[in-house]
Structures are given as structure tokens and as C-alpha cells.
Amino acid sequence: MSIAWYIQRFRTFSIPEILFRFHQRARTHILDKQIYKCSSKSNYSLPESSIIQNKNASFLYPIFEKNIDIFKPIDWHLDIQSEKRFPRKFSHQINIRSDEYGSAKHVWEINRLLFLTYIALQYKETNDSDFLDLFVFHVTSWVQENPYLEGVNWYSNIEINIRLINFYFCYQILNADLLRQTNSKFSEFYEKIWRPCIEKHAEFSFKHPSLFSSANNHLISEYAGLFVAACAFDIKQKEKKLIYAKKGLEREIIKQNSLEGVNREEAAEYIQFINDFFLIAAIVGQNTNHNFSENYFKQLHKIAHYLNQILDQNGNYPMYGDGDDGFVLLPDAHKHYNNFLSQLSSFAVLFKDASLKRENAIWDNKNELLFGEKGNAIFNSLESLGTPNRSSFFEKSGHFIFRKKNGNKETYLHFDAAPLGFLSIAAHGHADALSFILHVEGVPFLIDSGTFTYHTHKEWRKYFVGTLAHNTIRINQKDQATLAGPTMWLNHYDCQITSVGENFAEASHNGYKSEGVSHTRKIEFHPEEDSFTITDSLKSKKPFLAEIPFHLHPKIMVNAIGASFLLISENSRSVQIFTDTNLNY
């Protein structure tokens, strides 16, 4: 990163964080480097696998827009999108914030090892030892090609903890306790390769916490992964790590979510990702007699209700903030997997709450893995009472869902008057104050433009997080806050809810205070007419340029009719937009 970036990042630090960063730097670049230099490299011979050796065997597992063949050896350092490869050197010295080696995200997605649960399930369902051999082959290959602290796969702690969680579920699926007693080859593999790997993951997780301005979903993942590992495996300082991780989860579920159950990172796609850490920890805790507090479950219940309210009738979410298509657990090997709907079923079972079970609720392999046959029985016993049919306002958190549902017809609008994001850098927030998103019959019409990328293509990153990429107003070609790095905002705006009624909400923000402009937006819903009135008030003592974009889903067709625009979808009613005649479109 540039010197300018470091200066800006330093501005976000408190004095305690400055001390922590020095300590962290010593850990990663002095202590870790010594460990790396002194570590002996494993040189295991790869076990035989008839599936790997079979040239005709193939199974394509989705990795974003690409696939990997999990019936073949895997290059653990290759970015399959760019076909560039990350170097095998000391992990903390690798620059992931350029495209020199490609995108670390694509490499990490493979190395989360989500596909191992799928392979383990194939073994469980078929009792075919070929699948067990394939599982052992991939884990052995990973350990051999990723020595401790070598390569990009030891760079980010969140990746370490997602692997820990998947190791836990693989262990359960394989019934590894029994296998270790009955299968000498597997027992040797566990003792010499898998268990030491788990130990190193737990140690890394414990010693590399994401604290202060970085204490967002990364910290939650670290507590969750370590908690699960400490519950299930015989790791060093097991009790100490378990208590540490459990206390951390109890604290962060309150700290990182509002009293209304809204995640404070202001990144909707991350909700399903973060929820899984809290959910999985809760279930593993119950199963191992390490239960969480009543307050933990109360907050998780609120989170579940917010999740239900923000989804339209087809399970689509309003794409405010960053999204990276990340998953914690993915035993279903499908490209188009809706973890939001899967989680609703999980929460309905966990809380035995029929108000969380929708008419289109699903029971999938993930829920079967989490709850088993008993959970499925609870799921089937619940009525489907969870399909929302009216508006729901989360006023204190700044999120407003306007909704009318009648049979298969649904009008859905999300109005965002929330803070920019969480902590001093608001890493995954977008400058989208007072923006809105419109879906009809579960079809997105007016949308958030999305995320695209984090650390590469800097100009596109700046656009997609910027104000112009959202359905709000940009003043003088400037964003509502200052983007100082790919995941770092300065000069955060404040939103104020000025008026709320049964069918309307009004809010303002001060993101253009430096421009001498104030912006207030009021959204009124007329359910009898299925229409909205959106009124913007811009006040200033001097001239200014205002841009008011409307971003459409790519499948929406547009016809101009006089001063109005007709938006047409093949799968829903049409939408007509009437603009102020004084505006130039």
C-alpha cells in the first residue's frame, strides 16, 4: 500500500489501537517469521486415490463464476480466474492488494475447503471407501502444499477459522471417532497430518485477533472457529481458548448487531455469512454442553426476525453495502444456493418458531447437517406462518421495509437511512445514505449496483461503493463520505430519522455539510394504489450540481412515455416512474 494509505489508516486509530498495531506487527513480522524459518517442512507422500487416478472421473464444484474439479489434484495457490499464482513464501510478506498474483479472494475461496463436506457426505451416504481416500488425499495435499505461515492461505485469519469449522463438520460426517478405532490408515492420517493441521489452525486463530477498527466479521469468525475447535478437538490450552472464544462471541453478538437485530456493518450480503458463525457456534455449544447465555439466544432471535423481514417473497435481499458471495458451510454443491432461506429454516427449528418458517421454506443438506433427523421433525411440525405481508420498520437502525403482499403479488421497497458502516473505517459500507431498492413480485427493478471487487481495479471499486452507484442524490460529483482506501472510509456521515408514520418515513444526512448542502428524503407508500411518492429536499445558500440516478436490473426493459418511464419485466407487473418536470433526464 502507498504511504498516503498508511497515513489515512493511522488517522482511524485510537491510542490503544496504535499500541496494539505495534504488538501485532511484532507478532507477524518478527515472532511469526522466526517460527516460519525454524519450521520443518512436511514431506508426506500423497496417498493413493482411485478417483484421482481415474481419468474419466470428474465433479465440478462452483467457485464464483468458475469451477474446480474436486476429483482431480488441486493447485492451492492458483487464482483460477486470472490463472496467476501466488508465491510460496512467508505469508505476511505477500502483497494481496494488487493484481500481481491475481485475486487472493479466488484462491481463498478454494482453500476454505467447503467442498470437503460434500466429499465426506458422499462417503457417509455410499460407504464407498474411494470417497474417504479422496478426502484424505485432498487434506494431505493441502497440508503438504501449505506449510505453517507459508503462502497466501496463512495470510487472513478468517480463512483459517472457516477451515476449522469445516474440519469440525467433516469430522462429524465421517464419524471419525469410530474410524480412528476401526481404520488404521485413517487413524495414522489423523494423528500425523489432520490433527497437527487443526492444532496449527487453532494456534493461529488465537494469536492473530482482529481487534479495534478491524473488529468486524473477521473477529466473529475467529471466535467462532476457535470455539468450535475447542469444543471438538484436543488442542493445546483447550479450556483457555474455549472460554476466550465463548466470551468473545457473547460480546460481539451484542456489539455488532443493533437492539433490533440489524448487523452494524451495513452490508446485507454479509448478514447470512455472519449469522452462520453465531448459529453454528450456538448449535455446537448445545451439542457439546457449552451453552451460550439467554441474552445470546435472545439477540440471535432478533437477528432471525430481521433476516425474515428484509427478504422479498422469492428470498431476494436488498443489496446494500458490500457482498462477496462468501459462505461458512456449503455441503450442497450448487451454484445458486440461497443461504438466506436456508438460515430461516435453521432459525425456525432452533427457536421452534413458526413465524420464521415461510411458505417456500427449504430443508437442505446444511440443515440436515446442523440438526439431523430431530431437527427435520421439528421443521415439519411447524406451520408456515413466516411469510411477511406488511411493512416493517427498524427505525432505530435506519432500515425501512415497505411491503404489500396479496397472493403472488408483492410490492417491496427498502429505504436505507442507516449509518455508513461499523467502526472507524466502516470497511464494508457504501456511501448510500437515503437510497432505496424496489422489487415487484420478487423481481428486482431498482437495485443497488453491487460490489464488483475489493482490492483490485481501484477505480471500479471507488465507483461501486460511491454515491452515484446508488438510488440517492450525489452533490457536486462528490461522495457522501471520503473513500481513503478499498475498505476504509473517512468523514462518515450521520443519518437522522426526522419523521415516521404507518406508511411513510423521512430522514436526512449531513454527508454534504462541507458543500453547504443538506438532503432530506421522504418516502410515502400508498398501498391502495401500489404507489410511492418520493420527495427530496435539497437546501443550500449557493448553487450546486445534483445528480439523481435510478439503477435498473439488467433484465428490466425501459420505455420513455412523455415525462415518465415504463419499466417492464417478463415476470411481474410493470413499474412506471414519474419525475419532477423540472428535472433533466
Feature-to-residue mapping (PLM):
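Structured loops at beta-to-helix junctions and adjacent beta-edge loops in soluble globular domains
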Residues: D69, H77-Q81, H208, G323, ...
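Beta-strand-rich N-terminal accessory domains
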Residues: R9, F13, R21, K33, ...
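Aromatic-lined, polymer-binding surfaces characteristic
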Residues: F86-R88, Q93-R97, S103-H301, N316
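Residue-level detector of short, conserved catalytic/binding motifs and their immediate flanks
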Residues: L113, N161, A224, F400, ...
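CBM-like, beta-strand-rich accessory domains located in the C-terminal region of large
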Residues: N161, G323, L330-A333, A348-D364, ...
